Amino acid sequence: MGARGKTLVPLLVVVATAAMALQSTYLQVDPEKPELQEPDLLSGPCGHRTIPSRIVGGDDAELGRWPWQGSLRVWGNHLCGATLLNRRWVLTAAHCFQKDNDPFDWTVQFGELTSRPSLWNLQAYSNRYQIEDIFLSPKYSEQYPNDIALLKLSSPVTYNNFIQPICLLNSTYKFENRTDCWVTGWGAIGEDESLPSPNTLQEVQVAIINNSMCNHMYKKPDFRTNIWGDMVCAGTPEGGKDACFGDSGGPLACDQDTVWYQVGVVSWGIGCGRPNRPGVYTNISHHYNWIQSTMIRNGLLRPDPVPLLLFLTLAWASSLLRPA
């Protein structure tokens, strides 16, 4: 073998190895497994947590129990909750941006149990991500319906035991009338009671209330409003378990066969934990197509570079083997 051939063999080995490594970064989606999202929505497994097992009437959460929970921060201060959908996309409530919709002002903190990590917590800084772009639902007009927003991050999130994405479904009928779903957040623990230091993430178990019942509850005396089709209610008729101020944008999540799905986004309520005033959430399934199309239009999908890389390498190699 000539000098060209001697150079070519190790080069091809290096290129093939690099191509295999690159291909491994593109997670393959198995349609037979329910815990894997469609490839054009999420790039791999979702809804799994490492810890088995505001919020009014809640308890302190454990680190890693809700690994998709994010703290949406404006100028470094917690304002709303958020959830991680994949390495570049985050879901929250549109009304969080009523006063400031400049992406430069916003970051999302993942992997922390407190909304106020220590200044010396270098790990927290490494898990804080700048917002690149904000996408509000085109139907949102500073009113409660369509209260949903997608955030594109400026850099990809690094997954670990405490940072993982949650799953979405285009239909949440299977969660209707469930009594064992959860709301999480760093909001107030009562209408007149802020979350005390050390500002630990709170969790509370709530029941899904069908819209017909929720409308009936909200039409009782002293306040009347309508529960729209893109809303879902959760709580208890007697009150005491609810999201509160500062929980907006966070997840209402339910599990199915140990896989966790986000059913709703914390949107609004009358007070916090009042009887016959359950929390109202944006129904994820109602906006599933918008979430999907927004991600696709704005750069979620990337062409697989492996075939192109191998083709160009082989073409170049064949040119080297031609007689001089």
UniProtKB/Swiss-Prot annotation:
Q: What is its EC number?
A: 3.4.21.-
Q: Does the keyword Hydrolase apply?
A: yes
Where is this chain lipid-modified, annotation GPI-anchor amidated asparagine? 298
Q: Which GO terms describe its biological process?
A: proteolysis; spermatogenesis
Which UniProt keyword terms apply here?
Cell membrane, Disulfide bond, Glycoprotein, GPI-anchor, Hydrolase, Lipoprotein, Membrane, Protease, Serine protease, Signal, Zymogen
Gene Ontology cellular-component terms for this entry are: membrane; plasma membrane; side of membrane
Which residues does UniProt mark as catalytic?
A: 95, 147, 248
Membrane topology term: Lipid-anchor; GPI-anchor
Record propeptide residues = 22-54, 299-324
Question: Does this entry carry the keyword Signal?
Answer: yes
Give tissue specificity per the record. Answer: Testis.
Peptidase S1 domain mapped to chain residues = 55-296
Glycan attachment points? 170, 177, 210, 283
Entry-linked Pfam families = Trypsin
Question: Where is this protein chiefly located?
Answer: membrane
Which subcellular locations apply to this protein? Cell membrane
Specify the domain of life of the species encoding this protein: Eukaryota
The residues forming the signal peptide are 1-21
What molecular function does GO assign, one term? serine-type endopeptidase activity
Q: Which cysteines are joined by disulfide bonds?
A: 46-167, 80-96, 181-254, 214-233, 244-272
Q: What's its job?
A: Could regulate proteolytic events associated with testicular germ cell maturation.
Q: What is this protein called?
A: Testisin
